[in-house]
């Protein structure tokens, strides 16, 4: 028939036209990015994978639960290990969920299009498109699509950790924004909702980390002494890891870096209340616990021995009065009720006082201490002697022979001794007790 082409010719032409249009106008697909016209859905099982194929972001559910979460895990390990969960306390109730970009924010929608989680940021240029990207270090960021560096970040998952600290993540305060980055345990090994334990930085005087069970302080790390935290001597330098603690006008934060990126290591607060360093062992296909804190529930329990006493796992009982101090209540002390602590045999005279040196110690709690990083140990001793309220002193930094000064003017609490590491603490004594 004139003017009518063969059916297969029209079909072939239409197919080529559709293919050309889709190729020309469809967004460029990248395995680690999500554009404003793309989405992640439980139904399509799409995930984002970091460059290097180390970490993967997508939807998951735990074996015993029907609830769904948006989270991140190690991609290539035989043991599924989650390192971040977006909606840990607001899970999807069924297998219908969508992550997309809306109004310059990442939004997680449930089966009724109700928002269960959002980045909820308010800054940015509305005329500039945004993109979500999973970076090589595991940081999931929402950024200006025209800026690939940190200046373009509108939001980042590194600012909102769950129970895990990855290399390059920071634990502590951003003083410019007031943001406090801390870890909170899972409710159980099979439930990612917020659990009982949290690990937070306190920044008064000499910063250190506190482990809380709900609102109760159960352990403290001891202050950073330039090498590590004085109450965590197990966390020593490894050839493939660099530790850093920053304290300046912009931030007070701890981080660690890997010098060998083929090794996977992380810090985690477990559902049972342990802060742990874990490193993956390929030969065994398991996470190896390098150290765990609290190390023991004798000497690592907060203030177990009371004021002016110290804990030593190698003595019986474990609580001991500082040299030239005696139990405040001898009867209770004999019953191993140590919370009353110890008291001086001789009151300080403020003239002719001296010091006893305690080696390999976890420094006392520092929230009321006085810190001066500009002077050394000798000047620190003089300053302590010139203050009748001074009860002890120590170096703030133990590197290069010791620098800086920490002075205590109140009771000395939560002290313990170690077989190795720790640092020197100088406790003030009256002249009669120096013999």
Curated annotation (Swiss-Prot):
Q: Carries keyword Glycoprotein?
A: yes
- What processes in GO biological process is this protein linked to? rejection of self pollen
Q: Give the residue range of the signal peptide.
A: 1-30
Please list the tissues where expression of this protein has been recorded.
Answer: Stigma.
Bulb-type lectin domain span: 33-155
InterPro entries per record: Bulb-type_lectin_dom, Bulb-type_lectin_dom_sf, Pan_app, S_locus_glycoprot_dom, SLSG/EP1
Q: Which residues are glycosylated?
A: 113, 120, 244, 260, 389
Extract the PROSITE patterns matched here.
Answer: BULB_LECTIN, PAN
Keyword Signal listed: yes
List, for all copies, the residue spans of the domain called PAN. Answer: 350-430
Report disulfide bridges, numbered on this chain. Answer: 380-405, 388-390
CDD domains attached to this UniProt entry: B_lectin, PAN_AP_plant
Keywords on record: Disulfide bond, Glycoprotein, Self-incompatibility, Signal
> A Pfam family this protein belongs to?
S_locus_glycop
- Biological role: Involved in sporophytic self-incompatibility system (the inability of flowering plants to achieve self-fertilization).
Q: What is this protein called?
A: S-locus-specific glycoprotein BS29-2
Q: Which gene underlies this protein? A: SLSG
């Amino acid at each position: 028939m004139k003017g009518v082409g063969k059916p297969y010719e029209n079909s072939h032409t239409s197919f080529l036209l559709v293919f050309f249009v889709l190729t020309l106008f469809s967004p460029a697909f990248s395995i680690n990015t999500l554009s404003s016209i793309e989405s992640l859905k439980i139904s399509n099982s799409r995930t984002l994978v970091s460059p290097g194929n180390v970490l993967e972001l997508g939807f998951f559910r735990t074996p015993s639960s029907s609830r769904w979460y948006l989270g991140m895990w190690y991609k290539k390990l035989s043991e599924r290990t989650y390192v971040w969960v977006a909606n840990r306390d607001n899970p999807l109730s069924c297998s219908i969920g969508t992550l997309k970009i809306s109004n310059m924010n990442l939004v997680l929608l449930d089966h009724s299009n109700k928002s269960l989680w959002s980045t909820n940021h308010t800054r940015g240029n509305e005329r500039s498109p945004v993109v979500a990207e999973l970076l090589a270090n595991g940081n999931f960021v929402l950024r200006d699509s025209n800026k690939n560096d940190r200046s373009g970040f509108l939001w980042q998952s590194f600012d909102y950790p769950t129970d895990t600290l990855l290399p390059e993540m920071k634990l502590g305060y951003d003083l410019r924004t007031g943001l406090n980055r801390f870890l909170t345990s899972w409710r159980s090994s099979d439930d990612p909702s917020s659990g009982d334990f949290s690990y937070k930085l306190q920044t008064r005087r000499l910063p250190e980390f506190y482990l809380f069970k709900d609102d109760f302080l159960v352990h403290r790390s001891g202050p950073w002494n330039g090498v590590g935290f004085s109450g965590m001597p197990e966390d020593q330098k490894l050839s493939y890891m660099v530790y850093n603690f920053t304290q300046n006008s912009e931030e007070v934060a701890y981080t660690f870096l890997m010098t060998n990126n083929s090794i996977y290591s992380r810090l985690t607060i477990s559902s049972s209340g342990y802060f742990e360093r874990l490193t993956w062992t390929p030969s065994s296909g398991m996470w190896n616990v390098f150290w765990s804190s609290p190390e023991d529930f004798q000497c690592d329990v907060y203030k177990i021995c009371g004021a002016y006493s110290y804990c030593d796992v190698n003595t019986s009982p474990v609580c001991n009065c500082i040299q030239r101090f005696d139990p405040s209540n001898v009867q209770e002390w004999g019953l191993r009720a140590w919370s009353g602590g110890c008291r001086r045999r001789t009151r300080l005279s403020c003239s002719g006082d001296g010091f006893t040196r305690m080696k390999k110690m976890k420094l006392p709690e520092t929230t009321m201490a006085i810190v001066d990083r500009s002077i050394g140990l000798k000047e620190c001793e003089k300053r302590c002697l010139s203050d009748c309220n001074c009860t002890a002193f120590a170096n703030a930094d133990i590197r290069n022979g010791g620098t800086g000064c920490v002075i205590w003017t109140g009771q000395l609490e939560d002290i313990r001794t170690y077989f190795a590491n720790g640092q020197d603490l100088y406790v003030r004594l009256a002249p009669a007790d120096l013999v």
